[in-house]
From Swiss-Prot:
The modification N6-succinyllysine is found at K185, K481, K547, K573, K602. The keyword Mitochondrion applies. It is an enzyme of class 6 (ligase). PROSITE patterns: AMP_BINDING (PS00455). One of its GO terms (biological process) is fatty acid metabolic process. The modification N6-acetyllysine is found at K182, K185, K343, K401, K513, K547, K573. ATP binds at T266, S267, G268, T269, T270, G271, S272, P273, K274, D496, R511, K602. Pfam families: AMP-binding, AMP-binding_C. This is Medium-chain acyl-CoA ligase ACSF2, mitochondrial. It comes from the Eukaryota. Residues 1-44 form a transit peptide. CDD domains: FACL_like_2.
């Protein structure tokens, strides 16, 4: 057996340690001889050994590369759906309990073809952007797959967005079409759109001309006839003609797996959302690799029934949920339009669910249901918990009380399609409770000591960086911000502070920026601070995250009023309603007269956070 220097990226690591200015900078160059010596002490392994083993860090340094035993897939989403529909045509593909819809893979493929053909028939073309704005539903899954089938780029729009937030994302990517339900609960989608696009009421369907949204020409209503809109059923009917189905088949011949397929918005430190753009290649392979980590290929059809309470506009829901089910012929079960702990338990019991996806907050709510013990959860086997840090006691409760012995703790970012680290199902409870698992196949990770400018020692905190097939194409229309996030050697800087141990387990210990993760939602203080500064009584405001047993973190706005002004926390919360998403409204509003400062006058947010937690008795 020929020896090789392929041991988990050793040659790449050697080049990194050589001090390329584009990678580690000048300080790394000074450490070249030291790091090379560390590498020389590592035994070379054969290619077969590399593929058979669990990847380990190299040379006592925080660098690891996932195995490459299985080839990456060069398929579009449409080709994957076609393959699964041919392989298991009569297996249940989708169950929407709220709408009482059930489809087999053959039926889903037929509906997706009609929807994709229909979108082309109303004038949308390959590369056009279409926004999907609404809660979890059959229509969401249909549009997700239909846009991919037609080469149209899906823009995932947060269903809680208000008018200004909606306007920003639609203009940012030049959305040509927007799909939404008339309303859900108190969210009046059509009325919100009219605030920024009043022309829709008098427009001919498909021929909208908007002053503030010049790219938007087509508005599609999912469930009700509305002025200026097309009904989704009308789009499907238009796509049923042989002419348009043939047009779809023609277009599919020219789709590439490297074409963009999805834009997901993720906020930046300035508070302005950035459109992370993902390709078929990103999404197909991430869902395939995650399913492999979950060992879905070993499951029987009865064990392939996934309950998905996670939102589809999030990457975990659309990739780890919809796409992974599609890749492995698993049944996707939508328990409710938005998360509801009771509905999730009802879905598990009624549908004989075996896998469950969710954030820590969702699992806390499920476990805290007063009638939890009355549900039959005997069919549960495993699932994924991700989105924000989960305390060890919660991991143990999920495994023991929800019967999820094969639970996997996963970590990722939207920019990485999303999952880059995850446990193996057979990992111990302690390993799952104390880490986010080990590196995924075809993915590299390194932890950088930012002060020294080189790779961190094992068990030493530093910034986590990722490289591989999973890294996004870029931020839509923002090459400068893309360059700040992804360096010339294709390393993506996550902004998360992490450690790696000798076994390759990664632990997220903090964030290099002040992002708040509330129940799986990423919230950036700068965005809220800018918003509160529009209040006439506010002189200054600082927003921090404070600990919360249920949500992980809650938002605390520390407000300094202008001289002579008075107000209340209730007034401030009322000021937020209808202007920012409900999940961004601070739970705590504290009025202060000053902030903790450094000697140079900079606000010390970590000290402010500590002060607020003491003040609030958290």
């Amino acid at each position: 057996m020929r020896a090789t220097a392929a041991y988990v990226g050793m040659l790449r690591l050697g080049r990194m340690c050589a001090g390329s200015p584009g990678v580690l900078g000048a300080r790394a160059a000074l450490s070249r001889s030291w790091q090379e010596a560390r590498l020389q002490a590592v035994r070379f392994l054969s290619s077969r050994e590399v593929d058979r083993m669990v990847p380990l860090p190299v040379g006592g340094l925080s660098y690891v590369q996932g195995c490459t035993k299985n080839h990456l897939l060069s398929k579009t989403v449409g080709r994957c759906l076609e393959a699964t529909a041919q392989r298991v045509p009569e297996r249940e593909a989708l169950v929407d309990l709220h709408e009482n819809i059930r489809l087999t893979f053959a039926q889903l493929k037929e509906e997706v073809d009609k929807a994709a053909s229909g979108l082309l028939s109303i004038g949308l073309c390959k590369g056009d952007r279409l926004g999907m704005w609404g809660p979890n539903s059959y229509a969401w899954v249909l549009i997700q797959l239909a846009t991919a089938q037609a080469g149209i780029i899906l823009v995932s729009v947060n269903p809680a967005y208000q008018a200004t937030e909606l306007e920003y994302v639609l203009k940012k990517v030049g959305c040509k079409a927007l799909v939404f339900p008339k309303q859900f609960k108190t969210q009046q989608y059509y009325n919100i759109l009219k605030q920024i696009c009043p022309e829709v009421e008098n427009a001919q369907p498909g021929a909208l001309k908007s002053q503030r949204l010049p790219d938007l020409t087509t508005v599609i209503s999912v469930d009700a006839p509305l002025p200026g809109t097309l009904l989704l059923d009308e789009v499907l009917a238009a796509g049923s003609t042989q002419q348009h189905l043939e047009q779809l088949q023609h277009i599919q011949q020219f789709l590439s797996c490297h074409d963009p397929i999805n834009i997901q918005f993720t906020s930046g430190t300035t508070g302005s959302p950035k459109g992370a753009t993902l390709s078929h290649y990103n999404i197909v392979n991430n869902s395939s690799i995650l399913g492999e980590r979950l060992k879905l290929h070993e499951k029987t059809p009865e064990q392939l029934r996934m309950i998905l309470p996670s939102p589809l506009y999030h990457c975990l829901g659309s990739v780890g949920g919809t796409m992974m089910c599609l890749m492995y012929g698993a049944t996707l079960i939508l328990a409710s339009p938005v998360f509801n702990g009771k509905k999730a338990l009802e879905a598990i019991s009624r549908e004989r669910g075996s896998f469950l996806y969710g954030t820590p907050t969702m699992f806390v709510d499920i476990l805290n249901q007063p009638d939890f013990s009355s549900y039959d959860i005997s069919t549960m086997r495993g699932g994924v918990i991700a989105g924000s840090p989960a305390p060890p006691e919660l991991i143990r409760a999920i495994i023991n009380k929800i019967n999820m012995k094969d639970l996997v703790v996963a970590y990722g970012t939207t920019e990485n399609s999303p999952v880059t680290f995850a446990n193996f199902p057979e990992d111990t409870v302690e390993q799952k409770a104390e880490s986010v698992g080990r590196i995924m196949p075809h993915t590299e990770a390194r932890i950088m000591n930012m002060e020294a400018g080189m790779l961190a020692e094992l068990n030493t905190p530093g910034e986590l960086c990722i490289r591989g097939y999973c890294v996004m194409l870029g931020y839509w229309g923002e090459p400068q911000k893309t360059g700040e996030a992804v360096d010339q050697d294709k390393w993506y800087r996550t902004g998360d502070i992490a450690t790696m141990n000798e076994q390759g387990f990664c632990k997220i210990v903090g964030r290099s920026k002040d992002m708040i993760i509330r129940g799986g939602e990423n919230i950036y203080p700068a965005e809220l601070e800018d918003f509160f500064h529009t209040h006439p009584k506010v002189q200054e405001v600082q927003v921090v995250g404070v600990k919360d047993d249920r949500m992980g973190e809650e938002i605390c706005a520390c407000i300094r009023l202008k001289d002579g002004e008075e107000t209340t926390a209730e007034e401030m919360k009322a000021f937020c309603k209808g202007k920012i998403s409900h999940f961004k409204i601070p739970r705590y509003i504290v009025f202060v007269t000053n902030y903790p400062l450094t000697t140079s006058g900079k606000i010390q947010k970590f000290k402010l956070r500590e002060q607020m937690e003491r003040h609030l008795n958290l």
